[in-house]
C-alpha cells in the first residue's frame, strides 16, 4: 500500500472551486503526463502525445513549436497537450491558441472542466447519486 499523495497547491486552487477533488485532478495529470524527476514521478507540463506517441520537452517554447508542427502534420485530433493531455481537436476551443494549452494553470482548468462535463453526463439520469470519481476519471478521454 502507498500513502496518499497531497496534491500540489495549484491542483487544489483549480479543482476545489469547481467541485473536483484535487486528488482526482492530480491523478489524471500524473497518469497523462508523468515523468521521472529526481527519483519521483511527477506530471510534466510540456508533454505532447502525437498520434499515440508521447514527447517530453524541456521548455514551453520547445513544446509549443512541436505542438504547432504536430497539428500541421497530423491534424489537431491526433494531438494531446499539457498536464492533462487535453486533445486539441476536440477541446482546442478551451484555449485562445493551441500553445495556450501548455500553460499549466489553463490546462488544469480545462482538465477540470472536462471532468465536470463527464461527471454531469454520467449522472444526468441519476441526480443525487454519490459521485464515483474513479468512474468519472475513466471517462476522461471520451
Give the location of each predicted region.
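Catalytic glycan-binding domains that act on GlcNAc-containing polysaccharides
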Residues: 3-142
